[in-house]
């Protein structure tokens, strides 16, 4: 946010002013959810620029990871920021364009599906539960 603010001084900064969208926030009090909310609702040009650039970088790095790991079963994105910008990611081609933009490997990149995991699913707890279940089975069989 601060970087984009310094690089784009002409962009209106709504988040740091009292508006109909809320009270002004000091830089130290700004959270990612504030930036995402104002960006998704097109209420703050700077926040929109931040989310746009983040989404592009996210797509680039996700694509780089795909080339390293070759995830033919798909890539599963999860987390608070991902769930916050999922509508933006689905409606704007920046993520997928950055993901697939790998020179002569563009067509190859289309082999990998990208999924956004619903943030309401407790993935960590489900994983811990599965691990505990496997350990119980292993120990009950005398291994």
Residue ranges and their predicted role:
Residues 1-143:
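ATP-binding/phosphotransfer module of carbohydrate and carboxylate kinases, centering on a glycine-rich
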């Amino acid at each position: 946010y601060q970087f984009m603010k310094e690089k784009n001084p002409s962009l209106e900064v709504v988040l740091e002013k009292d508006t109909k969208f809320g009270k002004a926030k000091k830089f130290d009090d700004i959270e990612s959810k504030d930036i995402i909310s104002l960006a998704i609702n097109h209420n703050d040009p700077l926040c929109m620029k931040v989310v746009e650039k983040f989404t592009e970088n996210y797509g680039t790095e996700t694509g780089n990871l795909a080339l390293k790991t070759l995830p033919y079963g798909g890539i599963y994105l999860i987390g608070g920021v991902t769930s916050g910008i999922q509508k933006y990611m689905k409606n704007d081609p920046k993520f997928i364009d950055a993901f697939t933009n790998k020179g002569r490997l563009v067509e190859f990149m289309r082999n990998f599906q990208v999924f956004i995991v619903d943030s309401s699913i407790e993935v960590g707890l489900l994983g811990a539960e599965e691990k505990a279940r496997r350990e119980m089975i292993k120990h009950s069989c005398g291994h």
